[in-house]
């Protein structure tokens, strides 16, 4: 058997450094067969063929001294290393000794494509201004919209591709990505086309979501219903015609889109065949969780202000909650979603980064795991399930990613630790050793 060449030493540089170059699959020699052996913990997450609820969130199906046989980018078998090695005579060996191996993270809520940054907003928050105060003064979403509208396609793609590399270096292999910083027909399409291009020019799979109803643009402030009509009658048909999105999202919140406006837009999107995702109850308990249940949304995201009635409505309708503790942390708030109550109620909880320039500028799922444990009192196992297989099911990809099981894509990350709990425990430490997509090493 041939042994793969050694991989750079632990924690060589920051995950944002240039010591470990991200490679596209086409740049990596095709590996017909791989045998990953001797993982300290192979976190398979094998289990029900659906999103996990209740106690299932804690059942990781760990194999100690675990291994996988991978052929043509697909997991052929999973088990003890001794058994895997018997069938790996011609395989290239990946020695995962003293390391944790798990499915690549699945980030189910991001705003990846935008121009510039929000450093001024960050400094103003540090001085005590609220998110709403900053937005009212011309900052917030609108400042990013102006920069994104002004950016050329090529520049927008270059910035997004750089950020995509950050996700990969954090062990994330699938990313839901929203539009929402254009707020005109052509600028929203521009963002979604960038997301489509990212799918062809990076190793990550991006799942596109249309978020034209992210905010009322300045030019429609005095006539918000006209903008609602623009989204329904001009944006949505173009998005569907070009097959640029799988889902439609909306920011249902005070000062953005109210319940009735949200209902109109999402009903139109559903009629056009798009799945529904929603930003709800982030700043106020607006009844957004109940609307998500009424409309049969796939997910309801944020939920910081959701009450017991909202939780019950989501449970009854099978809506998956996507919890975003990174945005609570970055905004300096202490009002985290009621994760424990949602888990105890039987909801298939997800955690995600909410990566965006204003309220959660992090691509690190490990940081989110830490916040989920320390601030929302989820166990490390629950947080891990919520960031992999549950997230995959919310993107209708649970049958092919999110766990390490026979027949699934060989999308996985190897971490420089011996116990999966270290991912949440050592916050701020870059523990990603290597990342594989379709059985090819891409970092």
Stretches found by the model and what they are:
Residues 29, 43-102:
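Histidine-rich, glycine-flanked metal-binding segment
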Residues 39, 68, 73, 98, ...:
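Divalent metal-coordination and catalytic microenvironments
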Residues 91-159:
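Metal-associated gating/positioning segment near the N- to mid-region
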Residues 139-161, 165-166, 173-286:
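Metal-coordinating catalytic core of metallo-dependent amide/deamination hydrolases
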Residues 275-276, 285-403, 415-421, 427-429, ...:
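Active-site-adjacent C-terminal substructures of enzyme catalytic domains
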């Amino acid at each position: 058997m041939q042994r793969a060449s050694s991989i750079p030493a632990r924690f060589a540089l920051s995950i944002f450094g240039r010591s470990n170059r991200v490679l596209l699959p086409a740049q990596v020699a095709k590996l017909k067969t791989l045998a990953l052996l001797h993982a300290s913990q192979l976190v398979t997450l094998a289990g029900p063929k659906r999103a996990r609820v209740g106690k299932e969130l804690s059942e990781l199906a760990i194999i100690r001294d675990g291994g996988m046989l991978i052929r043509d980018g697909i997991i052929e078998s999973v088990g003890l290393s001794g058994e895997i090695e018997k069938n790996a005579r011609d395989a290239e060996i990946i020695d995962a000794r003293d390391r944790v191996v798990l499915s690549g993270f699945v980030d189910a809520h991001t705003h990846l494509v935008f121009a510039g940054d929000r450093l001024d907003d960050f400094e103003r928050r540090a001085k005590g201004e609220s998110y709403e105060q900053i937005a009212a003064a011309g900052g917030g979403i609108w400042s990013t919209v102006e920069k994104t509208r002004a950016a050329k396609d090529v520049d927008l793609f270059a910035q997004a591709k750089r950020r995509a590399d950050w996700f990969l270096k954090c062990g994330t292999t699938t990313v839901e990505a929203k539009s929402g910083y254009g707020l005109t027909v052509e600028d929203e399409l521009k963002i979604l086309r960038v997301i489509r291009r990212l799918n062809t020019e990076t190793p990550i799979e991006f799942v596109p979501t249309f978020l034209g109803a992210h905010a009322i643009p300045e030019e429609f402030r005095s006539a918000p219903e006209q903008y609602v009509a623009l989204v329904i009658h001009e944006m949505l048909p173009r998005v569907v015609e070009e097959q640029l999105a799988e889902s439609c999202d909306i920011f249902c919140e005070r000062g953005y889109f109210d319940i009735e406006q949200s209902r109109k837009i999402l009903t139109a999107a559903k009629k056009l065949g798009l799945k529904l995702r929603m930003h709800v109850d982030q700043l106020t308990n607006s009844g957004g969780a109940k609307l998500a249940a009424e409309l049969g949304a796939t997910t309801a995201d944020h939920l910081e202000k959701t009450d017991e009635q909202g939780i019950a409505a989501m449970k009854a309708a099978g809506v998956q909650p996507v919890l975003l503790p990174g945005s609570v942390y970055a905004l300096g708030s202490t009002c985290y979603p009621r994760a424990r109550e949602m888990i105890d109620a039987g909801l298939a909880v997800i955690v995600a980064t909410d990566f965006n320039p204003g309220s959660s500028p992090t691509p690190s799922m490990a940081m989110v795991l830490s916040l989920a444990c320390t601030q929302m009192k989820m166990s490390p196992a629950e947080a891990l399930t919520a960031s992999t297989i549950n997230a995959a099911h919310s993107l209708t990809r649970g049958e092919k990613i999110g766990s390490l099981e026979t027949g699934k894509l060989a999308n996985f990350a190897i971490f420089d630790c011996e116990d999966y709990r270290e991912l949440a425990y050592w916050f701020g430490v870059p523990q990603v050793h290597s990342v594989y997509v379709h059985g090819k090493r891409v970092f």
